[in-house]
A protein has these predicted regions:
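Catalytic, metal-anchored helix/loop core of enzyme active sites in primary metabolism
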Residues: 1-381
Length: 381
């Protein structure tokens, strides 16, 4: 069980809920980071009294330093300061809750210090899964997923000593706010429409990814990397109720599922307490009052981002970094209301076609592919 944690991305949805869990479990907080929200990070720092607080926006970091001048918390600014938070010696667990590729280098740094990684930054495994998993093996670092789907699979795999026993992993997907719509109808949806997730409360970027089904596509890639399985052993089903969080089908015909209320504090808590379990204040699942559980095939025509992610996973190399970088840039433009909803998959597909894929990539190759994909999107938006 974790005792002291660092949280990368403390002011976002996952970071905020992680601090709730830390308070409930009595965990100490060694470091907190965010991008630019000095006001919220100040409040968190005053409450949890970390040794280190980081804002990657340097102007905001200067503001935070003034705000926390009367405390013992050291304040650093700039992207490189994330690395210092990731290797903070007091922390035994690093929660990577930042959004996007910015989480990759800090995650690798924490792995080299043999920290437990409570992984909520899926882009790290999507873009550089082989490098990350190889590093975790080499340094003996433990990676425990925080995403509800991968936490569910992680739990369903407890006791599985041989990956050859697995027939397939089944990731559940709510379908997002536009489930059942045609491609034409989906294309007319606005920013406000996309940010209305039916079951979960999350940050804006991941909420849009859920609306396009890119989030599920990224989770397919993450599952392949985390559990070292090929694409044909990872499938997706639509499950509107978000009660079955994912399933594992074994070769003997047994199917194990993890169920629970749609509350991110549950997988966060498990990542903190694993291999133990601790009492939770979250609302328990009442099987007698929950709605009927339904399952359906996803519509890859109306939601092409899922297909684009699967194609990138099949190609390998830097294809997934290109996919992810293009998607991050396109979603940012959509949230800024500079492009329409249907432009997201269009721009991702065009960036994939424009940027060459390299196999067996180094970290530098992955970072270069990410930047090239972003530039390709900006050139075509």
């Amino acid at each position: 069980m974790s005792k002291t944690i660092s949280i990368l991305g403390a002011t976002g949805s996952i970071g905020h809920q992680t601090l709730d869990v830390a308070e409930q479990l009595g965990l100490r907080v060694a470091a907190l980071t965010a991008h630019s929200n000095a006001e919220r990070l100040e409040a968190q720092a005053r409450k949890f009294r970390p040794r280190l607080a980081v804002l990657t926006d340097e102007a905001a970091a200067k503001d935070l330093a003034v705000r926390l001048a009367d405390t013992d918390t050291r304040v650093l600014g700039g992207p490189e300061a994330l690395l210092e938070a990731a290797v903070c010696p007091e922390a035994d667990t690093v929660v990577t809750a930042v959004v996007g590729m910015v989480g990759l280098r800090p995650t690798l740094a924490a792995i080299r210090e043999k920290k437990r990684i409570a992984l909520a930054n899926k882009e790290t495994l999507v873009c550089a899964g082989q490098l990350v998993m190889d590093a975790a093996d080499a340094y003996g670092a433990e990676i425990v997923p925080v995403d509800s789907e991968h936490s569910a699979i992680f739990q369903c795999l407890q006791g599985c000593a041989d990956r050859r026993e697995i027939k397939r992993l089944i990731l559940t997907c709510s379908g997002g706010p536009f489930y059942g719509m045609t491609a034409e109808e989906v294309g007319k949806m606005t920013r406000a429409d996309a940010l209305r997730h039916p079951n979960w409360t999350m940050g804006p970027k991941i909420t849009v990814d859920c609306a396009t089904l890119m989030n599920k596509g990224l989770e397919v890639i993450e599952a392949m990397r985390l559990y070292r399985l090929p694409l044909d052993q990872v499938s997706v089903v639509i499950h509107r109720q978000s009660i079955v969080h994912s399933l594992v089908e074994y070769r003997d015909g047994a199917v194990l599922a993890q169920l629970g209320t749609p509350d991110m504090r549950l997988p966060i808590r498990y990542a903190m307490t694993y291999p133990e379990r601790a009492e939770s204040p979250a609302e328990p699942l009442d099987l007698l009052s929950c709605p009927p559980l339904t399952f359906a095939q996803p519509d890859r025509e109306a939601f092409p981002c899922l297909r684009l992610a699967e194609e990138a996973a099949e190609e390998g190399g830097t294809a997934c970094a290109i996919l992810n970088g293009a998607n991050e840039e396109a979603v940012g433009l959509f949230l800024a209301e500079k492009i329409g909803f249907s432009d997201i998959p269009r721009l991702v597909a065009e960036a994939r076609a424009a940027v060459a894929v390299r196999q067996g990539p180094s970290l530098e190759d992955i970072l270069a592919a990410d930047q090239a994909a972003r530039q390709a999107v900006l050139a075509r938006a």
